[in-house]
Amino acid sequence: MVSWCASVQAGIVLNTTRVIYQGNDKEVSLGVHNSGGGEILLQSWLEAPALATGNDPATQRLPFIVTPSLTRMAGGGKQLLRIIHSGTDMPTDRESVLWLNVQEIPQTAAQNTLQIAIRQRIKVFFRPDGMPGDPLQAPEQLNWKTGNNDSLQVENPGPYHVSMLKISVRQDDVELASIESQMLAPQQSLHIPLLRKKGGAPLVVSFVSINDYGGQVPYRATLANHESGYASKVMPR
């Protein structure tokens, strides 16, 4: 049995929530800690998002290796995982995203005892060398466009992914749309259905962007009727 988790459980703990792989780096690494008291097997691998490839991620051959891919960890032990790119077969004009899977396989216990494998997944962002722009400013490059009375569109024209939380669209303090989480890939657009807005009052779009360091940065945009606009950081008071 496999249990999926996005946060820490009594077992493996990763020292980061995302990995940024710069194209000119020979390798990147992250740490894993076995917070439990017993010995485990640690299995690690990369896969492409199914949405991006249209194929089963398990069948994809990627120009990366994770080492060690399988290793034993003592209770309380630590392990460094290395991700190495072979230097081929990745887009050179935009950032790519992969999933890093790290799975804890408990040692065999007594007969008739249920064993649960805990798996964590984090994103690996691969950035080719020489890409223009600043990824920390990518949320400000999103183009938000009002359409008819029941739609809003956001387009990412840049080469970087933008990860967002708590997207909210409001008009006169009435919420017209809410999305808990969304990642926009380079050149991707998203159509957001709205509860029917009324009159010509502006729309207020707010969201939280996750930066390279896992930090959460709030943004807000105000859109007049049938106009487009860009979001700005919400500065702390």
Segments from the language model and where they lie:
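Asparagine-centered strand-capping/turn motif at beta-strand->loop junctions
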Residues: 30-36, 152-158
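Intrinsically disordered, low-complexity Pro/Gly/Ser/Thr-rich segments with frequent PxxP/GP/PP motifs
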Residues: 54-89, 173-200
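Short, hydrophobic/aromatic beta-strand segments
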Residues: 38-46, 161-167, 219
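Sec/Tat signal peptide C-region and signal peptidase I cleavage site
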Residues: 4-10
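Beta-sheet-dominated interaction scaffolds and their linkers
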Residues: 10-35, 133-147
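Soluble periplasmic/extracytoplasmic beta-strand elements of cell-envelope proteins
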Residues: 31, 41-45, 80-82, 99-101, ...
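Terminal connector regions
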Residues: 86-131, 199-237
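Extracytoplasmic
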Residues: 25-27, 39, 78, 95-97, ...
